[in-house]
Structure formats: structure tokens, C-alpha cells
């Protein structure tokens, strides 16, 4: 059995963001030093209520790679409908190199309408079929980038 920590950076108390990030860094270091198998960061935007305050799980992963030695680093998840697939693949590959191959990739379509409409109008969750087509197209591109050539 393997154990991972889902680092959901909630901020119900409305702490200063730097304090929230420092606490997240401490949790990351603790998990690595205490032999957890993985740590997972979220991607959420525009959450003024204080929940899920991490906007970029890949950037959190870069910090984790620099401060840890063995823990695997995951994203729960990269909302791929918000991103250019080629740029996202490059960022994931760079994190994997910087971490010494410790990256686990998690992907999703998004859950909050205000995120989708502001990050990519094409990902509007009011049209689930359109959102899913965008997800499928982006996933196809991401998978094809594992190869040397793609169409």
C-alpha cells in the first residue's frame, strides 16, 4: 500500500498568502522526511471563499522538487481544458526533469464554472459536451507529445 498526501491549500481563516504557502512547504517537507510516498497539489482559480488556494500545481511541484529528496510529486489535478496542451506538456516535462523523474500527472476537466469561463471560454462547463470535446482533444495532444512526432 502507498500513501499520498492531498495538499488542499484551503484558507478559511483568510491568512496572508505567504503564510499559507509557508505552511504548505512545511507539510511537503514533513511528508518527505516521514516517508510518505507522494504529495498532490490542486489547481483552482478565483476562490474568494478561501478554499483551494493553489493556482498552479506545477509551480508548487517545482518548489517541492527543490526541497525534497524522494517523495513523488503529483497534481490533483492539472485542469487541462484551461491550458495550451503543448505548453502544459513542456511544463510537466521540465518538472519531471527537475525532480529527477518523480512526477505523477493528474488531469481533469474542471469543476467550477467561474474558473472555466475566465480561464478559457471554450471550457465553459454550462456546455458539458463542448467541455468534454476540449478535454478529449487536449488529452489526445498531450498523449501524442510522448512520441517524437505528432499530427
Where are these regions (language model features)?
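Flexible, glycine-rich active-site loops centered on histidine and acidic residues
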Residues: 2-19, 81-151
Amino acid at each position: 500500500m502507498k500513501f499520498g498526501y492531498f495538499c488542499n491549500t484551503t484558507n478559511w481563516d483568510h491568512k496572508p498568502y505567504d503564510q499559507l504557502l509557508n505552511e504548505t512547504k512545511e507539510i511537503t517537507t514533513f511528508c518527505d522526511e516521514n516517508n510518505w510516498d507522494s504529495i498532490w497539489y490542486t489547481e483552482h482559480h478565483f476562490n474568494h471563499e478561501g478554499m483551494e488556494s493553489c493556482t498552479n500545481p506545477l509551480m508548487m511541484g517545482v518548489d517541492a522538487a527543490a526541497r525534497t529528496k524522494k517523495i513523488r510529486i503529483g497534481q490533483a489535478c492539472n485542469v487541462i481544458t484551461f491550458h495550451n496542451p503543448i505548453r502544459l506538456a513542456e511544463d510537466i516535462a521540465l518538472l519531471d526533469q527537475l525532480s529527477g523523474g518523480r512526477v505523477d500527472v493528474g488531469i481533469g476537466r474542471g469543476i467550477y464554472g467561474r474558473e472555466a469561463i475566465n480561464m478559457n471560454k471554450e471550457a465553459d462547463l454550462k456546455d458539458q459536451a463542448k467541455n468534454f470535446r476540449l478535454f478529449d482533444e487536449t488529452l489526445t495532444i498531450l498523449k501524442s507529445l510522448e512520441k517524437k512526432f505528432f499530427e
